[in-house]
Amino acid sequence: MESWIFLGLILLIAYLGKNSSLLIAGAVVIVIKLFPFLSQKLYPVIQAKGINWGVTIISVAILIPIATGQIQFKDLINAMKTPAGWIAVVCGILVAILSKHGVNLLSSTPQVTVALVIGTIIGVVFLKGVAAGPVIAAGITYYLVTLLNLSFS
């Protein structure tokens, strides 16, 4: 029963915060939950592969401007001539490294997920952020926890 209340609260917050992504995600999870035979099969698969599917969809969206010719090699070369371009490259590298550790942390330490979900909901709903942050947040958490020699137990 608690999970229904929690999911309902997330839906309400998403609705009040006008966050369609979180609203759709919550609704999908609830619809799957309504059918136990579905949830037994789908939840483990979505939990195990969902982040990778999401990254794939984001990657496809990022590559579309290249496919349509909106971004060409000259744009890449011009970007690399600027400090902002180099900062973008470094940030891309850092996010990839953080995300790697974030995925590992989410897999090995499920209890951190609750805190990350709360932080993500607050960031998305109240600060108009984007819910792509849990993996990166988990990566940052991994580094801070390691740096400060902390644990989750």
Curated annotation (Swiss-Prot):
Ranges annotated as spanning the membrane: 4-24, 26-46, 51-71, 86-106, 116-136
The protein's matches in InterPro entries, at most eight in alphabetical order, are given as: UPF0756_TM (IPR007382)
- Looking at the record's lineage, which domain of life comes first? Bacteria
Q: Which UniProt keywords apply?
A: Cell membrane, Membrane, Transmembrane, Transmembrane helix
Asked whether the UniProt record includes Aminoacyl-tRNA synthetase among its keywords, one would answer: no
Quick one: where is this thing mainly located? Answer: membrane
Q: Which Pfam families match?
A: DUF441
Q: Does the keyword Transmembrane helix apply?
A: yes
Where does this protein reside within or beyond the cell? Cell membrane
Family assignment from sequence similarity: Belongs to the UPF0756 family.
Protein name (database record) = UPF0756 membrane protein LSL_0936
* Species the sequence originates in: Ligilactobacillus salivarius (strain UCC118) (Lactobacillus salivarius)
